[in-house]
Amino acid sequence: MIAYPNSANISLFLLRVKTDADDLGNQVLRLVGSKEVVGVTSSITSKEFYQSKETKVLLDFKVSIQAFLYDKSKYVYVPNEDTIYIVERSYQNGMWMELYCSETQLKKEEIEGWNL
């Protein structure tokens, strides 16, 4: 199999999540919308890694998606890993939007309206 540069290698969901209060006043997360996209993952550079350590925001990976697909979602769900990541930083690089992600402790069951 031949791998081509900038070929999509990950399928993920962009999650739009809203913080709300339930009937008892407890804080809950509600899924407002989701969008399935494909992207190109890459490791963060050593410079990005050390900068993230200085700010105490440890980045796990970077994924690039086509910029017009990005809807300012703050969470990313990777079905193959069954993991929810938070988008710590986004950066437009030409036609690509680079999303820098950190793993969260958030579980699907904790988000109301989960339907993925």
Predicted regions and their residues:
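Active-site-proximal polar cores
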Residues: 1-28
